[in-house]
A protein has these predicted regions:
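Conserved alpha-helical substructure of the radical SAM core
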Residues: 38-69
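A C-terminal junction/extension of Radical SAM enzymes
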Residues: 213-232
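A secondary-structure boundary/capping signal
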Residues: 24, 72-74
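Short, charged low-complexity linear segments at domain edges
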Residues: 1-18
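Conserved beta-strand termini and adjacent loop/short-helix elements that scaffold enzyme active sites
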Residues: 7, 191-193, 228-231
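Canonical Radical SAM [4Fe-4S] cluster-binding loop centered on the CxxxCxxC motif
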Residues: 15-50
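SEC14/CRAL-TRIO lipid-binding/transfer domains and related phosphoinositide-recognition modules
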Residues: 3-8, 27, 41, 53-54
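Conserved AdoMet/S-adenosylmethionine-binding subsite of the radical SAM
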Residues: 56-68, 77-209
Length: 232
């Protein structure tokens, strides 16, 4: 079963419209400088592991209080036995939302076609041209990410796209290009960056609400629902 490195026992944010628990798995194939979970990305083997039985027991006891489970990371589609783990969660009656960077479309498609995930949230790091600098990878697999985007745009799985917006890394042109790339998407969220010691490269800053609202208006020309998250 996948190594579980974190459990947020109650969240109203991670699975919109549901009272959910979020499970964090380790490892990632990106090295985004603004990543909020650097320890899970860089040194997952050094992080404490929560036994699967403990997590499933918690979920069993919380039935009737929780009504959803979010699986995040890291990049959860890299985890071994992810499918079996989700089957265990489904057996308890929970719908599952999967957070992903979109680099493993075959895993996403398989889980969706088996009815094992009810929603996907895909992190759009930047416009395609800027993926190398914002993912820390010289040659990120943009073909795979495009396959994920196309699958969601033209499929039946509920989804959202989202971008953590960093002042030093994103600008107006990014969102003009992203708006064209994701044209017709059902939902897109601009997430305000928050600096912390857990960030892979701390020291970045966030745009103001007014600046994020400007990006939102750009995106609304091609995407019908665009909202801002993370502003107090």
């Amino acid at each position: 079963m996948p190594a579980i490195h974190g459990l947020n026992k109650t969240t109203l944010l991670d699975y919109p419209g549901r009272v959910a628990a979020t499970i964090f798995l380790g490892s990632c194939n990106f090295r985004c400088p603004f990543c909020q979970n650097s320890s899970l990305v860089l040194h997952p083997a050094d992080e404490p592991v929560i036994p699967e039985e403990e997590v499933l027991s918690f979920l069993k006891k919380r039935r009737g209080i929780l009504d959803g489970v979010c699986i995040s990371g890291g990049e959860p589609t890299l985890a071994s036995d992810l499918e079996d783990f989700i089957c265990e969660i489904h057996a308890l009656g929970y719908p599952v939302k999967l957070d992903t960077n979109g680099t493993r479309p075959d895993v996403l498609k398989h889980l969706a076609e088996r009815g094992l995930i009810q929603k996907a949230a895909v992190d759009i790091k930047a416009c395609p041209d800027n993926y190398p600098s914002l993912t820390g990878m010289m040659h990120p697999d943009l073909t795979a990410i495009q396959e994920t985007v196309s699958f969601l745009l033209h499929g039946n799985l509920d989804y959202e796209f989202r971008t953590t917006v960093v002042k030093e890394l994103h600008n107006e042109n990014d969102f003009i290009q992203i708006g064209q790339w994701l044209k017709g998407a059902k939902a897109y969220y601009l997430q305000a960056y928050r600096d912390s010691d857990e960030v892979l490269q701390p020291g970045f800053s966030s745009y103001s609400l007014e600046e994020l609202e400007h990006f939102r208006k750009i995106l609304l020309t091609t995407i019908p629902l665009v909202e801002i998250r993370g502003i107090d």
